[in-house]
Each structure stands twice: as C-alpha cells, then as structure tokens.
Amino acid sequence: SIQEQNRQRFLKYQEQLRSELAARYFHSVMSTGGESFSNTKSLNFDGTDAYLEGATNYTLADGASKMTISCWVKFGLMSSTAYLASVRPSGGNRTFEIRTQGSGGSSSTFSLLFYVNNASNQNRFNKSIAGIRNDGLWHHLMICVDLSESTGDEVQFFIDKVAQNPAGRIQNTTFPSNPSPLLIGHGLGNDYFKGAVDEFAIWVGEDLRTQSKVDEIYGTGEATDLANLSTVSAPTTWFRMGDKATIVGDDITIPDQIGTYNLTSEAMIAADVQEDTPG
C-alpha cells in the first residue's frame, strides 16, 4: 500500500540520517592517529640546561615568505636572554628565532622578540610582555609572519588571541637557509628557557593572522586538535610535547604529529613530562 511504502521510506531516511550523524561525530572526535583528542601533559624546561633538538637540520621554512607559529607557554622567571625556539647554526645567522629578554628579577622589563637572519634591529620585531612573566598561568602565543607585507607589518604577535602589534621590520623577503636543527628551549650560550611549553606547531607557507583563524586555533582556551580544525589546514610540523612522548629512562622523544621531524631531549628527566596543561 501507499501507506506502507511511505513508512518504509521514512524508516530508510531515519537510518541514513543516523548513519550520517554518527559519521560526523566520529570525524569530530578523531585525530590523525585515529584516537580521540585529549591533552593531559606538557613539557617542563628548567632554565638551566634542558632543551629539545632535532636530529637533522630543519629546512622546511627555507625560501618561504610566510609562516605561523602557535604554542601554549607558561613563562617562568627568566632574566637576560632566553630562547623559546630557534633554527640557527652556532655563531651564525638564523632562519628564524623566538626569544625573550628581561632584566634581573624585575617583571617590568620582559620582552618577546622574533628574528629572521641576523641580529640587526632591521630584522626583528619586539613587544613587551612584562605582565605575563612568571604569573603562573598558561598563555597562548601565535607569531604570524608574511615577509612580503609592507615595512612594519611583516609580523604580528597574538597572546591569548589578542593582537599585540609589535614594533619592528624585517628586510628579508623570504626565510633564509641557515642549516641547523630546530631547538626548543635553547639557542646559544647560557640562554635556556624556563617554564613550560605545550602544543608547539609551525605552519610553513601560511600567515594565519586573520582573527577568525586565530580564534579557531585558540579554541576555548585549552589545547585544540590542530590537525582537524574547520577552516585552518593542518600544521607543517606539530609537537604535542608531553602527550605522545616516548620516555626511556630520562630520554624523551617528542614525535612530529604531521611529518617525521622528531625532537629528542637534552638534560631533561622523565618527570619533565608533567600533568600540567592549559585550560
């Protein structure tokens, strides 16, 4: 009968709808590794001699004009210069570099700097972030770069999704090749980062400073599955830091969640993988 045919069509429609909703839900909670996304660990840096280093030179940014770096950071009490991340041969110029500069124990003088190529003031951006040094809180940092932008607009910093409008300029129009491994927590000399870092990601070839994209990466104020965002593509390189780490004794390996550029620890202990996360 017509009534029975309509009933069968309705039942079939319900089944299709349930299947589609189930598929959407499954996709929304799955990460690239096929597991539901969770963030329970970060990595502690003691500020004395602990850092991470890649086994080979990090060349993915060479020749690119755009890049975005995103990470969650808890800034410790650092004085003088400390490096959050760098690709820089010993004694040479850098492909890029993120560092902080402070003065003594005063929290009133603490700046974030981003460098390309040499240490000239013509190749850097800087901004005071004195209010968040050693405040005991997690902060989301984004550094968005487009070296083809007009002078003074090449770099934008975001802290907790708020634009910081750093001052500076960069003369290079592309990231130079200065062969060196990627270091996190160290650069040159006695310059070790003190604090904690989580979810360190690099997008090569993309400037994600559009506010909607910044908001999407920031999420709800805690770590987000960067490989499955709605409008932002997966990073080029992504280190979960504590989560997904392999620990053998006091040797820690931090795997790249996207590619194959893994990091290994220097002067760290197993307890530096800690249950302290944003949010």
Language-model region placement:
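Extracytoplasmic low-complexity segments
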Residues: S1-D49, V214-G279
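Short surface loop/edge beta-strand patches of beta-sandwich-type extracellular domains
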Residues: N44-M67, R124-I132, H186-G189, G219-S230
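Extracellular glycan-recognition modules
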Residues: T48-L113, S148-E154, D191, E206-K213
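Short tryptophan-centered beta-strand motifs in secreted/extracellular beta-sheet-rich domains
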Residues: C71, G136-L147, F157, A201
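Short edge-strand/loop segments of extracellular domains
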Residues: S86-T95, E154-Q164, T220-D225
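Short, aromatic/His-centered strand-loop micro-motif at the edge of beta-sheets
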Residues: F114-H140
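Short, solvent-exposed beta-strand-to-loop segments that form ligand-recognition rims
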Residues: I159-P181, D225-L226
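Extracellular glycan-interaction patches encoded by glycine-rich segments
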Residues: S177-D198, D207, T220-L226
